[in-house]
């Protein structure tokens, strides 16, 4: 079909074909019309049609600006092999080597990707239930907590060969790393071994040896955060809906703070400079605690089912990923926060990793129905 291109102003007659479209070009409205089948609209009808076009233009303009101003923009989708099923746990990144480590729990392996191309470059097998990964660049070693075996597995970062393992209790899960001492803190034990208490184990990652076990009442521990300027560790005690504070020099529990503004506290972000702890709960809130007093300051609404939360000090942003979306808040001051946006991911897409050095945010979305598991790569705006 041949089309004539016509741009018209105000009350002038406008040729309109039986099929027409409006396009945005240099802020003008363009009408595409069929020469052979055209009629003319003038006067009031033209004004009404013009108003419709203006309205459509504004809608599209606002939508476009909204995408550009969103805190995250999807730039890549990495599709995983169809046999990768079940939930994911935590990511790790090797910045120098350009690698992204992912932990599909039921796949009994850690997947290694080239984070620049999205290519799957290695599958590290022989892991019953991978939970968390630490990569030490100086030693080129990969440390993986295995919940089934109840140990910390240590792999060579070049050959991916298993070097050794450190025996823990079953359900070895979340970790916290002290870069100064090279000690890794691992929560393990609890309900999976039919105990009403859990262990926070201390492992020397250089020697590959366990140094101590710190007993904590409660059968389920989750994410933790370590202070750099003091020996404190803050740990989510999900069993008791509280935050436990451990002195890592004395290796003992020194305080417990109740979390009353939300339920099922699992994820955690930390703003050490402003003494704010962001305790993310699966009930759909973040409770903000003052680490100088242990008191709750405020609560922020987030998507339910959260599994990962992080605070970025440079941008003063909080990222919390729940069941199907990421909520991003900006910290205007230590007690006040503004929601920047809620970005959709996918069903049960609730584990993620912010990598400020790459300006990227990675989200794992499990396999669902006929759709394979995916890793979504967002650019941070």
Where are these regions (language model features)?
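Bacterial N-terminal signal peptides
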Residues: 51-61
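Short, Lys/Arg-enriched N-terminal segments with co-localized hydrophobic residues
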Residues: 27-45
């Amino acid at each position: 079909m041949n089309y004539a291109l016509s741009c018209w102003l105000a009350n002038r007659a406008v040729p309109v074909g039986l099929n027409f479209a409006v396009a945005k070009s240099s802020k003008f409205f363009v009408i595409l019309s069929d020469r052979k089948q055209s009629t003319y609209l003038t006067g009031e009808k033209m004004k009404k049609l013009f108003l419709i076009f203006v309205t459509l233009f504004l809608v599209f303009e606002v939508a476009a600006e909204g995408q550009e101003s969103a805190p995250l923009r999807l730039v890549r989708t990495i599709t995983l092999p169809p046999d990768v099923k079940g939930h994911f746990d935590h990511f790790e990144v090797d910045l120098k080597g350009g690698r992204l480590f992912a932990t599909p729990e039921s796949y009994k392996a850690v997947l290694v990707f080239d984070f620049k191309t999205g290519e799957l470059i290695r599958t590290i097998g022989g892991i019953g239930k991978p939970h968390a990964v630490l990569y030490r660049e100086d030693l080129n070693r990969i440390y993986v907590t295995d919940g089934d075996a109840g140990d910390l597995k240590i792999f060579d970062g070049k050959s991916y060969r298993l070097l050794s393992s450190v025996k823990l209790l079953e359900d070895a899960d979340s970790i916290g790393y002290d870069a100064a001492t090279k000690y890794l803190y691992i929560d393990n034990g609890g309900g999976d071994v039919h105990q009403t208490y859990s262990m926070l184990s201390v492992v020397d990652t250089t020697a590959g040896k366990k140094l101590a076990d710190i007993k904590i009442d409660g059968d389920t521990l989750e994410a933790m955060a370590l202070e750099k300027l003091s020996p404190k560790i803050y740990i989510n005690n999900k069993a008791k809906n509280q935050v436990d504070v451990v002195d890592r020099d004395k290796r003992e529990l020194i305080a417990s703070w109740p979390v009353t503004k939300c339920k099922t506290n699992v994820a955690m972000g930390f703003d050490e400079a402003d003494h704010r702890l962001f305790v993310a709960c699966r009930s759909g809130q973040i409770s903000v605690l003052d680490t100088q007093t242990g008191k709750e300051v405020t609560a922020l609404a987030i998507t339910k089912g959260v599994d990962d939360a992080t605070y970025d000090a440079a941008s003063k942003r909080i990222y919390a990923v729940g069941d199907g979306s990421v909520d991003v808040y900006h910290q205007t001051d230590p007690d006040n926060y503004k929601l920047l946006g809620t970005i959709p991911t996918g069903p049960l897409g609730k584990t993620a990793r912010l990598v400020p050095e790459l300006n990227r945010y990675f989200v794992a979305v499990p396999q669902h129905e006929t759709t394979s598991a995916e890793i979504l790569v967002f650019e941070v705006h």
